Amino acid sequence: MELYYLITISDRDRAEMLSAIYHAAGTGMVLTKLGRGTATGEQLSSYGLDATEKAVVSTVADAEQTRQIFRAAKRKLFIDIPGNGVMMAIPLKSVAGGRTLGFLTDSTQT
C-alpha cells in the first residue's frame, strides 16, 4: 500500500474547503494548523501587497485518495494556478508498527 503525507498551504479562508475535499476523498484524519506568510514588511510594500494569514492542512492518504484530492483541489480551488496555494504529496516509505499503520489507514491495512 502506498501512503502519502499530503500538505496544502493556502489562505485561511480556503481551509474549510480544503478539509472538506480531504474528507470527501475518505481520509480519516485532517489536521489544520494556522500560520502566516513569511514575506517581510519591506517585501510586501515593494510589491503593494498585504500580509495574509495562512492555513496548513494535512492528512495521510493512499495513492487513489491522493489522486482524488489533487484533482478536486485543481477543479474547486484552482490550486495549480499561482497565487492560490501550494499542495504537495510526500511518500511515506515505511511506517513503524502495525498499530501505527492501522491508525493512519483507519485499519484498512494492518
Show which residues each predicted segment covers.
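Positively charged, small/polar-rich N-terminal and surface patches that mediate targeting and assembly
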Residues: 1-110
